[in-house]
Amino acid sequence: MSKDEYLITDAPLKALTVFAMPMILGSFFQQVYNMADSIIVGQFVGSSALAAVGACAALTNVFICIALGAGVGAGVLVSRYFGARDYSKMKTIVSTSLISFLILSVLLGIFGFCFSHSMMSLLQTPADILDEAVLYLRVYFVGFPFLFMYNILSTMFTSIGESKIPLGLLIFSSILNIFMDLWMVARLGLGVFGAALATLIAQGISAVFSLLIFFSRMRRYKSHFDWFDGKELHSMLRIAVPSVLQQSTVSIGMMIVQAVVNPFGTQALAGYSATMRVENVFSLIFVSIGNAVSPYVSQNFGAKKMERIKKGYHAALVLDLCFAVLAFIVIETLHTQISSLFLGKDGTALAYQVSGDYMRWLGYFFIFMGIKMATDGVLRGLGVMRPFLVANMVNLAIRLAVALIFAPRFGIEFVWLAVPAGWFANFVISYVALRKSWPTDKAASVC
């Protein structure tokens, strides 16, 4: 048995822990990568520049989620064929997805660059930070194909049980990004433009290294394959499109929520942006566990090991509980110090209050997000996409309804009061669907 097949051979808790930990560390470094811009800009340029970078976050998340969702469709099928040891189909999926998504990423990058000003204006970005926000966004879109391809390749690595290579590349690119941020922002005084340019260069180098290493890895699996297969593309899109819709729609929802926050002023936006970065750090821990569950489930489904799927789900819930407790302790103890990392000396009392209140509220309820992500991960791994999409749309609807209806009338606090309610509703719907979708040996035999 190959050492690459530990997801279908080792004890479920051990297999998921070994597989998920590099992904969790990778998520941490991904956020370090993203937060470097905010922290360095906030410390060396000021809170207005921080707000400009933060104002772009919700929009850039939409495009990142398109990349992540696109990778899900390919990743589920790669995992399934890998578990079944059908390396010919696996490599055909890999090639087809890389060609298709490279074209898509270039088109999205051109679209984003051309319409940056229009999109930021639609978000009601405060006038005093609009120009800097648009500048940051345009540089971001120049490098978008690199970001897109890196995320697709990371999904490919994890689909075959390899999560350490993406971690190594992320550590390298994060360190490079921080040093270049310090050089361009603090030393050269390039401000928001320097922060965006540093990120673009680091992403580009990381994407090229990922591509070279992945092609080298694929040579281990000797088999004939087609460079492009329309039928496999269709199969992949059946899973990818719902995932893209789910991930991008949720990010669009967050973008709309930011439009609700923007009228409260630059300092409220700075506080909200600071906590959004912190939310992303902890959220991606739970997202990583859910993403680890998907290839685990898909590989075991391909290998016709149905009982291991249930055990893997329970193991994921244990990991989620441990990290939810850790998040609560860290936020309760250090929320003021964490806020100061982003807001610096220029942050007003309002900015610190918004950041601290939002952060502590999230700390109480991260467990809901954890169990939601684990359940969604099983559904994705099984290819059960419709209830997965419905559950996430309900989550979005609750979050938007409360923010849009209550926040303008009663205060900014209602922006984050809806978050755990949406997570919990999502979990309930996903869990009911999962109970109806547990695979049987008979189902696997016709896979």
Model-based region annotation:
Residues 1-20, 78-143, 187-241, 297-364, ...:
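Short alpha-helical transmembrane segments in multi-pass integral membrane proteins
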Residues 50-110, 147-166, 271-335, 369-383, ...:
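Small-residue-rich hydrophobic transmembrane alpha-helices
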Residues 8-44, 58-73, 77, 102-109, ...:
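N-terminal transmembrane alpha-helices
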Residues 62-65, 177-181, 206-211, 281-284, ...:
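Hydrophobic transmembrane alpha-helices of multi-pass small-molecule transporters
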